[in-house]
Amino acid sequence: MKKIAIYPGTFDPLHKGHIDIIRRAVGLWDELYIAVADSPHKGTLFSLEERKAMIQNEFEESKNIKVISFNNLLIDLASSLSARILVRGLRVVSDFEYEFQMLGMNRTMNPDIETVFLMAEPQNQPISSN
């Protein structure tokens, strides 16, 4: 059985911190979906298609990375893709507090899906998207 993971985000824009997490995560599972959130309420700088294209261009050589978009609950997306892992990057303590709350909600909705946290490299900790 393939081990499938999802790294979700808005990626507005894709930056060095995202790229670092993706490069580290891609070798851990058979397939890594980069799930770009369609978040019209966030007032993104770049369109959904532009954000997807940034990621596709950066990782065009990677055969086990798939770039998709989503506008529903992440946990539902994971179930539809048979993904058992959600990948999240952590930079600072406030990231952990938010992610801990999300982890609790996700575990309530689907206890079979695990969340794996990758710490940002020190040089990428100050970097944040929009």
What residue ranges belong to the model's regions?
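Nucleotidyltransferase catalytic core that binds NTPs
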Residues: 1-130
